[in-house]
């Protein structure tokens, strides 16, 4: 069973909005109480929240489907439905959210950072909210909107200050175990480390985090070995450290060629966070070299031989031994100095400014195109949303939809493009036979929908009518 998972595909679905209610107020001695249907509740959203206590994406490996609660239906007596609760999904610090096209949506760093992965649907309006001067007693309500659903890829990129890279069995895990309290698995065979290991290193009154990445081999950036799966964990590192095995007996291996091979893999790797204003490219990150295993006499001689050549590249070089713990303190304080200098020099993340994108004045909000088969296709956020809100089992609701489309200008545009009565018109997932509201076209005034003739005329005699009747009787008596 996998215990460390750093990449998963999850299926998020927000809650749908509750349907509105169509009801009439009923009370003794009030025969014309009017509409009192409440609105539906908003659907719950799926929200990712960074939790420092979570360190892996293992939970999503077994439960990849995440669904929020839907809103409740509205009720009579102007009672709105309850809103669905937002579903907060805990993710590790350093999680990157990608859409199904690989586009970066969010980089979640820092405890409490939130990202709305799927937005809940809006609740439908009840007939009380739909009532107006022209439509006093609506006999229908709007349906709730479906919640947003999309597939997302979560990648965990370890939040560490120093990343240790090197060939398998170079001593990276051993180095982490002696400079921190981490206890990674250590053995004398390649690819012992299968998952990244983190260790907190104390440098005087300061501390920094070191990440041990599984060993790299030539071709790791193209997917060979384990490198492609774990190179993402060094994207956030301020300092990259080459850990070189100076005691290796493999033919064709030496410290210079090992470092050149690793640099070629780092240059070929395309990080997801490339182009971030705060993080430099991997090629521009400061480097350090650790020549390991100098407790072996031949390894010490080789390390001293190549030390000057590596120093000419401008990289600090440390000769260490994890067995005798030689030169570990200079290494720790040297790495802390490099981390602090890099963090002080790089620009701080600017706060995100709200961007307001007003709708253009000449934007009608929809578009009508011929489908090539004698029909037409209407696209646009509002018409498609209105289709989803309409209960097509209610004739009055269908008429209300027709009025909304006519006010938006859809009917006039269809007439302008030569639409004939009975032609097929598609809006969203609904296709219907179009019939103009009036034979004269779209410029004729529409009659109001949802009117109640009982509210227009009444047989009840008011005070003014009684006063006029008494005046007429007095005039007749005088005559």
From Swiss-Prot:
Residues 2-159 form the Obg domain. Residues 358-436 form the OCT domain. It is found in: Cytoplasm. Pfam families: DUF1967, GTP1_OBG, MMR_HSR1. Mg(2+) binds at residues 173, 193. The keyword Cytoplasm applies. GTP binds at residues 166-173, 191-195, 212-215, 292-295, 321-323. GO terms for biological process: ribosome biogenesis. Its main location: cytoplasm. Keywords: Cytoplasm, GTP-binding, Hydrolase, Magnesium, Metal-binding, Nucleotide-binding. Residues 160-340 form the OBG-type G domain. Belongs to the TRAFAC class OBG-HflX-like GTPase superfamily. OBG GTPase family. This is GTPase Obg. The gene is obg.
